[in-house]
Amino acid sequence: GGVPVFVDIRKDTLNIDERLIEDAITPHTKAIIPVHYAGVACEMDTIMEIARNHNLFVIEDAAHALETKYKNQKIGNLGNPTAFSFYANKNITTGEGGMLVLNDDFLADKLRILRLHGISRDAWKRYGKSGFTHWELHSPGYKYNMADINAAIGIHQLKKVDRFFQLRKKYASLYDLAFDQISELETF
């Protein structure tokens, strides 16, 4: 039932302009969702301070920032939760799917139930070594769980994260060099 309120981006990073966030906050605001775009981290110290001052959640969108760091700390350690995407055009791929990281056991348990159509136990637990166990439908839910084959692809892709990152940096520098002589184009 939430209504998104958009905040403009910074020209130098293409990320949310943290200086404009407070003007967009209303009594109905529940969360700030910074998007770390193209491997560039948002100004998280400022965003977290604004969130604390207004008692808001911070949900980090790190779909394009798997290897990104903010002040030498991996993205995903500040907001709660942080969402990563592993779609085909992301930093690594599983074909479909993604990952949430969070530091809140209550929220993690709730999200685990929601990801399986509101069912209390997944198939591995229902049909594991101990045999069939009963499950309950706790609430309406969604189909957010990743298939095992996609997870296996992701585990293999994780081994290549550093190499993929170095290749993207190399290609970005080639674009910078190619566009350097065109005054109408600005790269960063």
What are these regions (language model features)?
Residues 35, 59-60:
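Hydrophobic residues in beta-strands of the RecA-like P-loop NTPase core, especially within AAA+ ATPase
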Residues 8, 19, 23, 31-35, ...:
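PLP-dependent aminotransferase class I/II
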Residues 30-31, 57, 81:
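Short, Asp-centered acidic motifs that coordinate Mg2+ and/or phosphate
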Residues 84-85, 98-103, 155:
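Short beta-strand-to-turn element immediately C-terminal to the catalytic PLP-Schiff-base lysine
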Residues 1:
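Structured binding elements
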Residues 12-13, 39, 90:
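Glycine-/small-residue-rich active-site loops that bind phosphorylated ligands and cofactors
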Residues 60-94, 133-138:
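Conserved active-site segment immediately N-terminal to the catalytic lysine
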